[in-house]
């Protein structure tokens, strides 16, 4: 008996000071193992987005119109167009993944894109700035938008839905202020934007578009952050149980600050790509982009309640939406019907997650 007591005392002596509180220690262990338990619970669920992607791809091949006996959908040019078209919304969806995983929502990403695209065009055409200065300034502006969102949410204790809804209006208002209320065309060549800015929306030779490569690089970096860093583990933990995370010593406010800042930063990056591809920035751009981003995240297996999900699933969700939009366009389906189908798909994805 004395031997057991001495061993217990030795174990307590070795235990760090912050573990001396048994309640706090148990909570800390809970947060530390959230990721491992989550893997065991949702390993099968993670496959659903990819099963859906394969299914949608197969259906697209079946329902695609043909030209000269060849399936138009499988044409290399069409597939690269899909990648190019989903890049902007996909980048936004990656940022939205951080926010939703942390238990929040960001409705201002579409307006942030419009603000970033408009600011880019104004700096290039009216300010005479070069590509590096423009890109850095616009990304900093996007980061500031996210910081404001996070500060009001965490310090004011206001729901993210309300705060970002207000920022949705404010960011679009800022876009109108910097542009004078109208779109600004940039163009390239004499008197236009630098050719280096055009490369942001161009292709690498005859292969993949640069926006698609940026999108895939963003997914890769987000995967590393969410799966290989302490911040990523904290994002999952806060979304799973904010109270337990706070009790264990996690700085919940800073985690949310990081998530919302990353989201707005990526929305600004998407705005730069948007401006480079369309050769203009317009305060009215990006309408309903937040819905597409949320749809991609949810279809990718991340519930709106947060805590569980992967950025790879978001990639799959983005491609699913892109393929559906493409095949509907190839079949000349009315745009209003496309919106209706998108809503049905989102509801279906949520129902599948609950089973």
Language-model segments: which ranges?
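Transmembrane helix-bundle core of multi-pass membrane transporters
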Residues: 160-229, 257-258, 278-283
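Short loop segments and helix-boundary regions at transmembrane helix junctions
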Residues: 38-44, 102-105, 124-126, 144-188, ...
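Transmembrane alpha-helical segments of polytopic membrane transport and secretion proteins
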Residues: 1-51, 352-355
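Transmembrane alpha-helical segments in multi-pass inner-membrane proteins
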Residues: 261, 267, 277-343
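Single transmembrane alpha-helix segments in multi-pass membrane proteins
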Residues: 57-62, 75-127, 152-158, 297, ...
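Membrane-interfacial amphipathic/re-entrant helices at transmembrane-helix boundaries
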Residues: 25-93, 128-133
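Helix-loop-helix "hairpin" substructures at the membrane interface of multi-pass membrane proteins
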Residues: 129-138, 144-149, 153, 205-281
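Hydrophobic core segments of alpha-helical transmembrane domains in multi-pass membrane transport
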Residues: 49-62, 96, 169-173, 214-223, ...
């Amino acid at each position: 008996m004395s031997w057991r007591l001495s061993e217990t005392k030795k174990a307590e002596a070795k235990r760090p000071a912050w573990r001396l509180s048994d309640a706090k220690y148990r909570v800390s262990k809970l947060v530390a193992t959230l990721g491992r338990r989550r893997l065991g619970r949702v390993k099968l669920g993670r496959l659903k987005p990819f099963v859906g992607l394969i299914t949608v791809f197969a259906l697209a091949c079946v329902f695609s119109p043909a030209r000269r006996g060849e399936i138009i959908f499988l044409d290399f040019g069409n597939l690269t167009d899909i990648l190019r078209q989903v890049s902007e919304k996909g980048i936004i969806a990656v940022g939205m993944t951080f926010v939703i995983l942390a238990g929040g929502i960001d409705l201002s990403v579409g307006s942030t894109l419009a603000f970033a695209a408009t600011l880019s065009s104004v700096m290039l055409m009216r300010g005479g700035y070069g590509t590096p200065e423009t890109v850095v300034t616009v990304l900093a502006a996007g980061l500031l938008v996210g910081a404001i969102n996070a500060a009001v949410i965490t310090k004011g204790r206001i729901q993210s839905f309300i705060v970002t809804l207000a920022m949705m209006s404010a960011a679009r208002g800022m876009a109108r202020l910097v542009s004078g209320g109208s779109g600004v065309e940039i163009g390239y060549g004499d008197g236009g934007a630098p050719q280096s800015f055009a490369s942001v929306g161009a292709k690498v030779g005859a292969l993949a578009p640069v926006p698609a490569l940026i999108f895939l690089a963003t997914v890769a970096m987000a995967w590393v952050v969410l799966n290989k860093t302490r911040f990523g583990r904290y994002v999952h933990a806060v979304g799973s149980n904010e109270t337990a995370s706070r009790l264990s010593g996690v700085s919940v406010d800073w985690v949310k600050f990081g998530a919302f800042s990353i989201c707005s930063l990526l929305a600004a990056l998407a705005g730069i790509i948007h401006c480079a591809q369309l050769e203009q920035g317009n305060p009215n751009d990006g309408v309903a982009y937040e819905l597409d981003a949320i749809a991609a995240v949810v279809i990718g297996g991340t519930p709106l309640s947060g805590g569980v999900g992967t950025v790879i699933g978001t990639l799959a969700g983005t491609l699913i939406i892109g393929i559906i939009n493409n095949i509907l366009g190839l079949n000349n389906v009315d745009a209003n019907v496309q919106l209706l189908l998108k809503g049905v798909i989102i509801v279906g994805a949520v129902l599948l997650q609950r089973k």
